[in-house]
Curated annotation (Swiss-Prot):
Any one Gene Ontology BP term: hydrogen peroxide catabolic process
Subunit structure: Heterotetramer of two alpha chains and two beta chains.
Highest taxon, organism lineage: Eukaryota
Molecular function in Gene Ontology: haptoglobin binding; heme binding; metal ion binding; organic acid binding; oxygen binding; oxygen carrier activity; peroxidase activity
Family: Belongs to the globin family.
Protein name as it appears in the record: Hemoglobin subunit beta-1
Positions of transmembrane segments: none
Species per Swiss-Prot/TrEMBL record: Muraena helena
Keyword rRNA-binding: no
Residues reported to bind heme b: 63, 92
PANTHER family named among the record's database cross-references: HEMOGLOBIN FAMILY MEMBER (PTHR11442), HEMOGLOBIN SUBUNIT EPSILON (PTHR11442:SF7)
Length: 146
């Protein structure tokens, strides 16, 4: 993937405003609430029986931060996203057996959370660059499946 200087700037500028713990928790909670079948991967998280339980679950919060910390690796390695995610893709496909469609669901929820957080700053132009970036991340995470 080729990144223009404007795209690089847009991604790093947006990412610089993101609190990984805050956004990660809200995005992962949204996935678990909106797509309840994804909860099957998180049985060790305890109570996921309601919106309040999911939103207040410390394990959801902690893993949400882990997820965003992982996305941050792509931000810092825009020219080698696939290589950056090789081991993580293997883990999710070979060990955790995560359906790769769930990466898209998480990306969609993350985009919604960012739009809500940043409002008018999250312009269509910013979203277009963000979607390109997320597509690369999702492709890299799904790489071991195919």
């Amino acid at each position: 993937v080729e990144w223009s200087s404007n795209e690089r700037s847009t991604i790093t500028s947006l990412w610089g405003k993101i609190n990984n713990a805050e956004i990660g928790q809200v995005a992962l909670a949204r996935v678990l609430i909106v797509y309840p079948w994804t909860q099957r991967y998180f049985g060790q998280f305890g109570d996921l029986s309601s919106i309040a339980a999911i939103s207040g679950n410390p394990k959801v919060a902690a893993h949400g931060k882990v997820v965003l910390d992982g996305v941050e690796k792509a931000v810092k390695n825009l020219d080698s996203i696939k290589a950056t995610y090789t081991k993580l893709s293997q883990l999710h496909s070979d060990t955790l057996n995560v359906d790769p469609d769930n990466f898209k669901l998480l990306g969609d929820c993350l985009t919604i959370v960012l739009s809500a957080k940043f409002g008018a700053e999250f312009t269509p132009a910013v979203q277009a660059v963000w979607q390109k970036f997320l597509s690369c991340v999702i492709s890299a995470l799904s790489r071991q499946y195919f």
